[in-house]
Amino acid sequence: MSDLPLDLVEEILSRVSATSLKRLRSTCKQWNTLFKKRSFSQKHFHIAPKESMVLMLKEYRVCSMNINLNVSPPSVEFQGTLGIKDDSHSNLGQVEIVEVYHCDGLLLCATRDNRLVVWNPCLGETRWIQLKDECRRYSTFALGYENNKFCRRNYKILRYWGWFHDHIPDDGGRFRFEIYDFRSDSWKVLDDVPDDRFPPRDLIILVFRHLEIMVLWLYQLLEKNNSQCYKRLRHQRWRYL
Protein backbone atom coordinates (compact mmCIF):
# COMPACT_ATOMS: atom_id res chain seq x y z
CA MET A 1 0.00 0.00 0.00
CA SER A 2 3.04 2.27 0.11
CA ASP A 3 2.54 3.19 -3.56
CA LEU A 4 -1.08 4.21 -3.12
CA PRO A 5 -2.17 7.84 -2.71
CA LEU A 6 -2.63 8.87 0.91
CA ASP A 7 -6.31 9.68 0.47
CA LEU A 8 -6.93 6.18 -0.90
CA VAL A 9 -5.00 4.64 2.00
CA GLU A 10 -7.14 6.63 4.41
CA GLU A 11 -10.30 5.43 2.68
CA ILE A 12 -9.19 1.80 2.98
CA LEU A 13 -8.05 2.02 6.60
CA SER A 14 -11.22 3.82 7.66
CA ARG A 15 -13.10 0.60 6.84
CA VAL A 16 -10.88 -1.58 9.03
CA SER A 17 -12.22 -2.66 12.42
CA ALA A 18 -10.90 -0.96 15.56
CA THR A 19 -9.24 -4.10 16.93
CA SER A 20 -7.36 -4.59 13.66
CA LEU A 21 -6.22 -0.95 13.66
CA LYS A 22 -4.53 -1.57 17.00
CA ARG A 23 -2.28 -4.19 15.41
CA LEU A 24 -1.53 -1.90 12.45
CA ARG A 25 -0.28 1.01 14.55
CA SER A 26 3.23 -0.42 14.82
CA THR A 27 3.35 -1.38 11.14
CA CYS A 28 3.88 2.08 9.66
CA LYS A 29 4.67 5.45 11.24
CA GLN A 30 2.63 7.23 8.57
CA TRP A 31 -0.41 5.11 9.43
CA ASN A 32 0.08 5.69 13.14
CA THR A 33 0.11 9.45 12.50
CA LEU A 34 -3.04 9.10 10.40
CA PHE A 35 -4.85 7.20 13.17
CA LYS A 36 -4.29 10.13 15.55
CA LYS A 37 -5.95 12.69 13.29
CA ARG A 38 -9.38 13.92 14.29
CA SER A 39 -10.71 13.72 10.72
CA PHE A 40 -9.72 10.06 10.45
CA SER A 41 -11.27 9.22 13.83
CA GLN A 42 -14.58 10.73 12.79
CA LYS A 43 -14.52 8.99 9.41
CA HIS A 44 -13.59 5.65 10.97
CA PHE A 45 -16.38 5.98 13.54
CA HIS A 46 -19.02 6.31 10.83
CA ILE A 47 -17.65 3.88 8.22
CA ALA A 48 -15.87 1.04 10.02
CA PRO A 49 -17.84 -2.11 10.90
CA LYS A 50 -19.24 -1.98 14.40
CA GLU A 51 -17.87 -4.47 16.90
CA SER A 52 -19.00 -5.53 20.32
CA MET A 53 -16.64 -6.42 23.14
CA VAL A 54 -17.85 -8.25 26.23
CA LEU A 55 -15.84 -7.32 29.30
CA MET A 56 -16.02 -8.47 32.90
CA LEU A 57 -14.34 -7.21 36.05
CA LYS A 58 -12.79 -10.19 37.83
CA GLU A 59 -10.28 -10.12 40.69
CA TYR A 60 -9.44 -6.45 40.04
CA ARG A 61 -8.76 -7.13 36.35
CA VAL A 62 -10.75 -6.36 33.21
CA CYS A 63 -11.21 -9.60 31.29
CA SER A 64 -12.46 -10.12 27.76
CA MET A 65 -15.10 -12.78 27.26
CA ASN A 66 -16.55 -14.79 24.41
CA ILE A 67 -20.25 -15.57 24.82
CA ASN A 68 -21.90 -18.03 22.46
CA LEU A 69 -25.70 -18.04 22.63
CA ASN A 70 -26.09 -20.32 19.60
CA VAL A 71 -25.29 -23.50 21.53
CA SER A 72 -27.18 -25.32 24.27
CA PRO A 73 -26.39 -24.57 26.97
CA PRO A 74 -24.87 -21.16 26.13
CA SER A 75 -21.12 -21.04 26.69
CA VAL A 76 -18.99 -18.38 28.34
CA GLU A 77 -15.24 -18.39 27.73
CA PHE A 78 -12.63 -16.10 29.28
CA GLN A 79 -10.21 -14.97 26.59
CA GLY A 80 -7.68 -13.21 28.76
CA THR A 81 -6.88 -10.17 30.86
CA LEU A 82 -6.53 -6.74 29.27
CA GLY A 83 -3.57 -4.80 30.61
CA ILE A 84 -3.58 -1.06 31.29
CA LYS A 85 -0.49 0.98 30.55
CA ASP A 86 0.81 2.74 33.65
CA ASP A 87 3.96 4.82 33.36
CA SER A 88 4.54 4.63 37.12
CA HIS A 89 4.70 0.82 37.09
CA SER A 90 6.81 -1.45 34.92
CA ASN A 91 4.38 -4.35 35.33
CA LEU A 92 1.01 -4.02 33.61
CA GLY A 93 -0.53 -6.45 36.08
CA GLN A 94 -0.03 -4.08 39.01
CA VAL A 95 -3.05 -1.92 38.09
CA GLU A 96 -5.93 -3.18 40.24
CA ILE A 97 -9.38 -1.97 39.16
CA VAL A 98 -12.35 -1.82 41.51
CA GLU A 99 -14.97 -0.06 39.35
CA VAL A 100 -15.57 0.40 35.63
CA TYR A 101 -17.86 2.90 33.89
CA HIS A 102 -18.51 2.93 30.15
CA CYS A 103 -19.31 5.55 27.55
CA ASP A 104 -18.87 5.60 23.79
CA GLY A 105 -16.33 2.76 23.74
CA LEU A 106 -14.23 4.29 26.52
CA LEU A 107 -13.81 2.84 30.01
CA LEU A 108 -13.46 4.96 33.13
CA CYS A 109 -11.65 2.81 35.68
CA ALA A 110 -11.27 3.52 39.39
CA THR A 111 -8.21 1.74 40.76
CA ARG A 112 -7.69 0.16 44.15
CA ASP A 113 -5.12 2.82 45.06
CA ASN A 114 -7.64 5.65 44.52
CA ARG A 115 -6.72 6.74 41.02
CA LEU A 116 -8.74 7.28 37.85
CA VAL A 117 -7.86 6.30 34.31
CA VAL A 118 -9.79 6.60 31.06
CA TRP A 119 -8.95 3.68 28.84
CA ASN A 120 -9.58 2.79 25.21
CA PRO A 121 -9.27 -1.02 25.29
CA CYS A 122 -9.27 -1.33 21.48
CA LEU A 123 -6.36 1.04 20.90
CA GLY A 124 -4.66 0.48 24.26
CA GLU A 125 -4.54 4.23 24.97
CA THR A 126 -4.92 5.59 28.50
CA ARG A 127 -5.27 8.92 30.22
CA TRP A 128 -4.61 9.10 33.94
CA ILE A 129 -6.63 11.69 35.85
CA GLN A 130 -5.45 13.24 39.07
CA LEU A 131 -7.94 13.33 41.92
CA LYS A 132 -7.68 16.36 44.18
CA ASP A 133 -7.98 14.18 47.27
CA GLU A 134 -7.78 10.53 48.25
CA CYS A 135 -11.14 10.32 49.98
CA ARG A 136 -13.16 7.97 47.80
CA ARG A 137 -15.48 6.50 50.40
CA TYR A 138 -18.93 6.17 48.84
CA SER A 139 -17.68 7.81 45.64
CA THR A 140 -19.60 7.26 42.43
CA PHE A 141 -18.39 8.28 38.97
CA ALA A 142 -20.07 8.66 35.60
CA LEU A 143 -18.48 9.21 32.19
CA GLY A 144 -20.23 11.19 29.49
CA TYR A 145 -19.76 14.03 27.05
CA GLU A 146 -21.11 17.44 26.20
CA ASN A 147 -22.54 17.36 22.69
CA ASN A 148 -21.77 20.64 20.94
CA LYS A 149 -22.52 20.95 17.23
CA PHE A 150 -19.73 23.50 16.81
CA CYS A 151 -16.97 21.24 18.10
CA ARG A 152 -16.18 17.60 18.77
CA ARG A 153 -17.39 15.81 21.87
CA ASN A 154 -16.04 17.20 25.11
CA TYR A 155 -15.85 14.29 27.51
CA LYS A 156 -16.50 14.92 31.19
CA ILE A 157 -16.59 12.98 34.44
CA LEU A 158 -19.16 13.49 37.16
CA ARG A 159 -17.99 12.55 40.64
CA TYR A 160 -20.40 12.22 43.53
CA TRP A 161 -19.00 11.36 46.93
CA GLY A 162 -19.65 11.76 50.62
CA TRP A 163 -18.54 10.88 54.10
CA PHE A 164 -20.49 9.91 57.19
CA HIS A 165 -20.30 10.05 60.97
CA ASP A 166 -20.66 6.48 62.21
CA HIS A 167 -21.35 7.55 65.78
CA ILE A 168 -24.39 9.67 64.82
CA PRO A 169 -27.59 7.65 64.20
CA ASP A 170 -29.37 8.36 60.89
CA ASP A 171 -26.68 10.83 59.91
CA GLY A 172 -27.21 12.09 56.37
CA GLY A 173 -23.53 12.78 55.86
CA ARG A 174 -21.84 15.44 53.76
CA PHE A 175 -21.61 15.29 50.00
CA ARG A 176 -19.71 16.84 47.12
CA PHE A 177 -20.26 16.98 43.39
CA GLU A 178 -17.35 17.59 41.03
CA ILE A 179 -17.07 17.73 37.25
CA TYR A 180 -13.86 16.97 35.39
CA ASP A 181 -13.37 18.59 31.99
CA PHE A 182 -11.04 16.75 29.61
CA ARG A 183 -10.17 19.86 27.59
CA SER A 184 -9.08 21.96 30.52
CA ASP A 185 -7.76 18.97 32.50
CA SER A 186 -9.34 20.34 35.65
CA TRP A 187 -12.00 19.60 38.26
CA LYS A 188 -14.84 21.97 39.07
CA VAL A 189 -16.66 21.72 42.39
CA LEU A 190 -20.40 22.33 42.51
CA ASP A 191 -20.18 24.08 45.84
CA ASP A 192 -23.79 25.23 46.02
CA VAL A 193 -25.34 21.77 46.43
CA PRO A 194 -27.05 21.70 49.86
CA ASP A 195 -25.95 18.96 52.27
CA ASP A 196 -29.35 18.45 53.85
CA ARG A 197 -31.34 17.42 50.79
CA PHE A 198 -30.14 13.85 50.31
CA PRO A 199 -31.59 10.48 51.33
CA PRO A 200 -30.22 8.53 54.30
CA ARG A 201 -27.20 6.31 54.21
CA ASP A 202 -28.92 3.17 52.97
CA LEU A 203 -30.02 4.97 49.78
CA ILE A 204 -26.73 6.75 49.15
CA ILE A 205 -24.94 3.47 48.42
CA LEU A 206 -27.12 2.98 45.33
CA VAL A 207 -24.89 3.34 42.28
CA PHE A 208 -26.06 5.80 39.62
CA ARG A 209 -24.22 4.50 36.58
CA HIS A 210 -25.72 6.76 33.94
CA LEU A 211 -25.23 10.50 33.72
CA GLU A 212 -28.76 11.13 32.51
CA ILE A 213 -30.17 9.18 35.46
CA MET A 214 -27.84 10.93 37.89
CA VAL A 215 -28.60 14.42 36.63
CA LEU A 216 -32.34 13.75 36.35
CA TRP A 217 -32.30 12.61 39.97
CA LEU A 218 -30.56 15.83 40.94
CA TYR A 219 -33.10 17.86 38.97
CA GLN A 220 -35.99 16.35 40.87
CA LEU A 221 -34.21 16.71 44.18
CA LEU A 222 -32.99 20.27 43.87
CA GLU A 223 -35.52 21.97 41.62
CA LYS A 224 -37.68 23.33 44.44
CA ASN A 225 -34.92 23.80 46.99
CA ASN A 226 -31.96 25.25 45.15
CA SER A 227 -32.88 26.79 41.81
CA GLN A 228 -29.37 28.08 41.11
CA CYS A 229 -27.76 24.64 41.40
CA TYR A 230 -30.61 23.14 39.39
CA LYS A 231 -29.99 25.57 36.54
CA ARG A 232 -26.25 24.86 36.53
CA LEU A 233 -26.78 21.13 36.24
CA ARG A 234 -29.54 21.52 33.68
CA HIS A 235 -27.33 23.41 31.26
CA GLN A 236 -24.56 20.77 31.28
CA ARG A 237 -26.35 18.94 28.41
CA TRP A 238 -24.94 15.52 29.20
CA ARG A 239 -25.12 12.50 26.96
CA TYR A 240 -24.44 8.92 27.93
CA LEU A 241 -24.17 5.95 25.58
Curated annotation (Swiss-Prot):
Matching Pfam families: F-box
Cystine pairs: none
InterPro entries assigned: F-box-assoc_interact_dom, F-box-like_dom_sf, F-box_dom, SCF_F-box_component
Limits of the F-box domain: 1-44
Protein origin, superkingdom: Eukaryota
PANTHER family the record matches: BNACNNG10540D PROTEIN, F-BOX PROTEIN CPR30-LIKE
Protein name, as recorded: F-box protein At3g22350
Gene source species: Arabidopsis thaliana
